[in-house]
Amino acid sequence: MTKFSDRIKKSAKASPIILANDYDPKIPNIESKTLRNIKLLNNYLCGIKINFHLLLRLDKNQISKINKTAHDHGLQCIADIKLNDIENTNLITAENLWNMGFDAVIVNPIMGKKSLKNLVEISHKKNKGVISLCHMSAPEAKASYELEIENRLKKQQLYQLFLDWAITGNVDGIIVGATYPKIISYCKKSIH
């Protein structure tokens, strides 16, 4: 199996769009609706992202079926759970996600630089990916992600520290909410 970063790049050549398969929790038949989305939209996508609140409503067999169907259509599967616990919990959670067919997991780097780096290294050994959150789209997230911190004589905002950790930790991608175009621009310049 090839690396996640190579697989997503290959899929993105056809289309750079990742479907955020985010349904209202009250919507019934999530599995069948998700399978229908994959079958109808796969030619326009490179991947599908499933949020935590939807995963909680599906059993292991349903999740595996969704991921297999996505793979059969050439799509990458991303678990958007913003994983951010102690290292052992992160590793066990990631292993369970991999066993259900996910290709990558979205994490919140609040877990710490070392835990993030270790999760990336272990995931990469299994050809899986880690996508790290830098800043959330929710308006109230500004209060935390833009906190000014001082770290070894360097003042910066928390999202900038998270970006530094993502780069040095060799994550496969970062996430910045679309509601913050200046921060997207900052992150893009920092990566290139």
Task: Give the label of every model feature segment.
Residues 1-77, 154-159, 165-172:
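Conserved N-terminal beta1-alpha1 strand-loop-helix module at the mouth
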Residues 13, 23-26, 87-181, 190:
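Conserved anion-binding
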Residues 53-56, 82-90:
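Conserved PLP phosphate-binding loop immediately N-terminal to the Schiff-base lysine helix
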